[in-house]
């Protein structure tokens, strides 16, 4: 009987390189929200991948970028604080983007960490094979990576090979979570993220970064349905109007799409009620950020 391996693996990189898509593909379920808009992930989100021989807990971190407000500061600290708490690190970049200052900043942070770091070049389906080697060499010039894996998270190219390498590299250890558990976050957190994803999909560019979702209540199932009540938080009355839409149509569409994903995730019929609340400048209000679950003082 082979030894069982287990451990924690951080996924780090600039905003919008495909970290959440990668983790969702591996798990076969949507637990981290995806959007073409940058800075979608705000918290560290743990996804649990289990096989008979291993259990890998992937930590999907917020994209690292120059902070513009207290929320951005929280997101950067959340990502960087993960590095010393895991067994291995996946540094994800895009195959169709040249190495930039943001990548250099991340690699300087990685230089302080005594963990194996794997360079993951995502979206290889968007470039010609001959274009990959110069990109790989440019990254290897600046950092001694444990291994390099060109992958396509959407097409699942080379993902199995990466999982095998990670399994072999992780220490011998127990299975931390039941085999059917996909995340250690509570249901209300994942539900809030799925609602926020639909807002990102449907609203204009001026709204997404100013939006938060607070799930107030998930009641026991009544009449065969799970009752969920949530507030969508925005900073301005104009943003509230955009999210509600003419005759309430935008809010209705957000609810319809979110309910569909929530039902798929939880396996239950859902009655979802949404309201929109204006909280001016909430992204720079530490007390309000804490009430939403963001607390930079907890990050060291």
UniProtKB/Swiss-Prot annotation:
- List, alphabetically, the InterPro entries matched: G_ERA_dom, GTP-bd, GTPase_Era-like, KH_dom-like_a/b, KH_dom_type_2, KH_sf_prok-type, P-loop_NTPase, Small_GTP-bd
Q: Region G2: start and end of each range?
A: 39-43
Q: Which UniProt keywords apply?
A: Cell membrane, Cytoplasm, GTP-binding, Membrane, Nucleotide-binding, Ribosome biogenesis, RNA-binding, rRNA-binding
Q: What biological processes does GO assign it? A: ribosomal small subunit assembly
Q: Which GO terms describe its cellular component?
A: cytosol; plasma membrane
Which residue intervals make up region (G4)? 122-125
Q: Where is this region: G1?
A: 13-20
Q: Which residues form a coiled coil?
A: none
Role this protein plays: An essential GTPase that binds both GDP and GTP, with rapid nucleotide exchange. Plays a role in 16S rRNA processing and 30S ribosomal subunit biogenesis and possibly also in cell cycle regulation and energy metabolism.
Specify the protein name: GTPase Era
Q: Which organism is it from?
A: Lacticaseibacillus paracasei (strain ATCC 334 / BCRC 17002 / CCUG 31169 / CIP 107868 / KCTC 3260 / NRRL B-441) (Lactobacillus paracasei)
């Amino acid at each position: 009987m082979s030894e069982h391996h287990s451990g924690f693996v951080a996924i780090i990189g600039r905003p919008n390189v495909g970290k959440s898509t990668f983790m969702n593909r591996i798990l076969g379920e949507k637990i981290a929200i995806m959007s073409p808009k940058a800075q979608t992930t705000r918290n560290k989100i743990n996804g649990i991948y289990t096989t008979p021989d291993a259990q890998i807990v992937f930590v999907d971190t917020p994209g690292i970028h120059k902070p513009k407000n207290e929320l951005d500061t929280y997101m950067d600290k959340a990502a960087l604080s993960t590095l010393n708490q895991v067994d291995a690190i996946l540094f994800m970049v895009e195959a169709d983007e040249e190495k930039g200052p943001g990548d250099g900043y991340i690699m300087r942070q990685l230089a302080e960490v005594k963990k194996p770091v794997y360079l993951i070049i995502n979206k290889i389906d968007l470039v010609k094979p001959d274009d990959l080697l110069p990109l790989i060499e440019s990254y290897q010039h600046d950092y001694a990576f444990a291994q390099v894996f060109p992958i396509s998270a959407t097409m699942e190219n080379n993902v199995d090979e990466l999982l095998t390498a990670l399994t072999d590299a992780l220490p011998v250890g127990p299975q931390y979570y039941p085999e059917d558990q996909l995340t250690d976050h509570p249901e209300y957190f994942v539900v809030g993220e799925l609602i926020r994803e639909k807002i990102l999909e449907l609203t204009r560019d001026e709204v997404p970064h100013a939006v938060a979702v607070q799930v107030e209540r998930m009641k026991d199932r009544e009449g065969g349905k799970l009752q969920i009540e949530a507030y969508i938080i925005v900073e301005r009355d104009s943003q509230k109007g955009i999210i509600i839409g003419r005759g309430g149509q935008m809010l209705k569409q957000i609810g319809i799409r979110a309910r569909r994903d929530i039902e798929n995730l939880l396996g239950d019929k859902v009655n979802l009620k949404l309201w929109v609340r204006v909280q001016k400048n909430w992204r720079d209000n530490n007390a309000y950020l804490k009430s939403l679950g963001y607390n930079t003082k907890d990050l060291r």
